[in-house]
Amino acid sequence: MNGRDIRICTIFAFAKMEFMEKLHPIMFAGTGSDVGKSIIAAAFCRIFKQDGYQPAPFKAQNMALNSFATPEGLEIGRAQAVQAEAAGVPCHTDMNPLLLKPQSDHTSQVVLNGRPIGNRNAYDYFRKEGRDELRREVCAAYDRLAARYNPVVLEGAGSISEINLRDTDLVNLPMALHAGADVILVGDIDRGGVFASVYGSLMLLRPHERERIKGILINKFRGDIRLFESGITMLEELCGIPVVGVVPYYRDIYIEEEDSVALAAKSVRAEKGKVNIAVILLRHLSNFTDFNVLERDPRVHLFYTNNVDELAKADVILLPGSKSTLDDLYELRRNGVAAAIIRAHREGATVMGICGGYQIMGQEVLDPEHVEGDIERLPGLGLLPISTRMSGEKVTRQVKFGLCNPHSPLMQGYEIHMGVTTPVEGTPDSPLNLLENGSTDGYYVDSTCMGTYIHGILDNPEFIDFLLAPFADKLSGNAGAFDYHTFKEEQYDRLAEHVRRHVNLPLIYQILTKNHD
């Protein structure tokens, strides 16, 4: 979608909003991390869209290695991009004005309004100094968003009751109070202790904060809901707040996940009878959503590994993006995975790198300005005749591109990287992709060795067909690639239907239209 199309859609949306009842903003806050706030928020973005509203997601501060480039070439958390997709609106930095991208256990890159403003350690970041300025920025972003959409669907972060961080919190109840949002507290019953986590979370809030909690939603329920009916009554009596839904655990709906904890459930071994594609488990792996489409492709088996024996069974090895390329390259050399990748390629495996993985495949990675850390130079895997020099300037943009051949269709993806990559001296340029603006991307040795800076490249079925072409003998009889965009739209609709069936939607609409004055 180009700028003109976005403007037309926005004008149409404003006209439509005039005829829709104004809803209060709604926030989904949690009793802890990974209770399902992001997915529930995405579900309600789609529900409100289906019901004729013009919703938009908002999370004041997100911490994630998976990010996305907006149409303006700025950076936001992947979860808000997914929620915007569910809402049917273009993603924008106002939906996630503050993004923290971990670089180590103690340090994160801080991205404000889509642009990096430096690295901060956790202690300095969570001190009071500078928080007022950040608070003004995130509140201003929310205000701009609220003027354009109805309703705004806010997402909290972690636990709503981290009382030691209360004075510096930017994302939970202080944001709900600024927005005047009705808060739904989400608890995860699957991990156990949901009564204590819900009741305890509420009791740790100050009275004026507790007044903002308008409903309780129990998520990830397994079993017969009738066995929990007495529990609903008990919770409502204890808390004085209605339970607005009990949403069952699901296995057959696919929504992109942002947190790296999702990797724990991925396959870790090769499988006979399909093209085996191994993704290297880097310590600082970022944008693992690049590979989600391959999990759904019936022709391949995708697995994540650092096991050198499993790598030897792979037909294709994918080196993913990294938030700390030099540190991950050092670790690959130390643990023997680098040697295993080189050996597998020598024995016939295809190796492809994306972003940081592309940099790792080269002859060397240089960081004389210490952009990433203390390591100034490391030799790469030597599979591509390129050299990368780290730079403090970040490239963030959506791109349209084709393969460097006259018959390639136009595809799309996005770039988020720091560093400039060039062919080593005396080596001819051999780009993998030609961008719509005439510039080039990546390096192509042959069909078994290539690299690119473009995230989302595998979301294009034409590129997957190109990548799998050398394995035609293994693909015979298997179905072809599928339309990933259509698949995702179907999944958003299925998620919305699943949540609709298990929440009291009339009560939620009543909450969002009630005069609280």
Name each model-derived stretch.
Residues 362-418:
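A conserved active-site-flanking secondary-structure segment within enzyme catalytic domains
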Residues 176, 338-345, 350, 366-382:
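An internal, acidic/charged active-site-proximal segment
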Residues 355:
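Catalytic nucleophile serine of serine hydrolases
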Residues 11, 18-343, 350, 392-393, ...:
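Flexible phosphate-sensing "switch/lid" loops adjacent to ATP/NTP-binding sites
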